[in-house]
């Protein structure tokens, strides 16, 4: 098997042992770049309130769409500055992880979903889901913002936001074991795929000088 690529073809990082790749078979990215992620968040500011907070949660926490849709008020730690997600791909139930998020996200969640009020009631609404939507409804809300932001392709999806979080974290120098914890990966080798994507991003930046 030759390592030679056709002119203009992007280098595709190797897959993890579990098969995860950040490029599809055509070499298209499955993750948003830093600029695309920022554009998505700016566009989300104009979306309906519940769609906006869902988009912000996905972008700033790196969680899976199903994990975001399972989030309840009692798992929003305003004092600690974290969101607590049930890690849905673990083999056993009851596995949670705390992910630090920006104050702006916590403020938006409180404003739109009444987090403080729900937590004060304790048991009378604090366990209700913030977004009582099906997975398809949540996906459509995110997709609508992607379209409005002019984003398309495999990266323009909730999974693309999750991958963008991983790439941004590694690019910022966050240790891989910390990124693994935040993303809820069972194996560090899965998280390590984002280091390959950083290399591809650096190549794109360098190409601007050539």
Where are these regions (language model features)?
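Conserved tyrosine-mediated DNA breakage-rejoining catalytic core shared by Y-recombinases
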Residues: 1-2, 10, 34, 70-111, ...
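Short, charged phosphate-coordinating catalytic segments
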Residues: 58-80, 177-178
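Basic, Lys/Arg- and aromatic-enriched nucleic-acid-binding interface segment
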Residues: 34-65, 123
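Flexible interdomain linker/hinge and immediately adjacent N-terminus
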Residues: 1-39, 86, 92
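DNA/chromatin major-groove-contacting recognition/catalytic segments
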Residues: 14-17, 97-100, 196-210
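Catalytic-site neighborhood detector that most strongly recognizes the C-terminal catalytic loop/helix
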Residues: 87-91, 183, 187-208
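Short, basic (Lys/Arg/His-rich) helix/loop patches that form interaction surfaces
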Residues: 42-47, 120-126, 140-181
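C-terminal catalytic core of Y-nucleophile DNA break-rejoin enzymes
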Residues: 26, 90-111, 122-144
């Amino acid at each position: 098997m030759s390592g030679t690529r056709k002119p203009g073809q992007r280098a595709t990082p190797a897959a993890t042992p579990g098969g995860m790749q950040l490029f599809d078979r055509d070499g298209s990215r499955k993750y948003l770049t830093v600029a695309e992620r920022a554009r998505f968040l700016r566009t989300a500011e104009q979306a309906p309130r519940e769609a906006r907070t869902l988009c912000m949660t996905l972008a700033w926490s790196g969680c899976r769409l199903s994990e975001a849709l399972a989030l309840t008020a009692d798992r929003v730690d305003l004092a600690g500055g974290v969101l607590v997600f049930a890690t849905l791909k673990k083999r056993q139930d009851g596995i949670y992880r705390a992910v630090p998020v920006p104050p702006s996200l916590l403020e938006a969640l409180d404003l739109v979903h009444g987090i403080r009020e729900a937590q004060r009631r304790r048991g009378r609404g604090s366990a209700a889901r913030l977004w009582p939507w099906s997975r398809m409804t949540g996906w459509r809300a995110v997709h609508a913002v992607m379209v409005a932001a002019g984003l398309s392709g495999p990266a323009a999806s909730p999974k693309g936001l999750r991958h963008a979080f991983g790439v941004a974290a590694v690019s910022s120098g966050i240790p891989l074991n910390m990124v693994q914890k935040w993303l809820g990966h069972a194996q560090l080798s899965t998280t390590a795929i984002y280091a390959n994507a950083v290399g591809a991003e650096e190549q794109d930046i360098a190409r601007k000088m050539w």
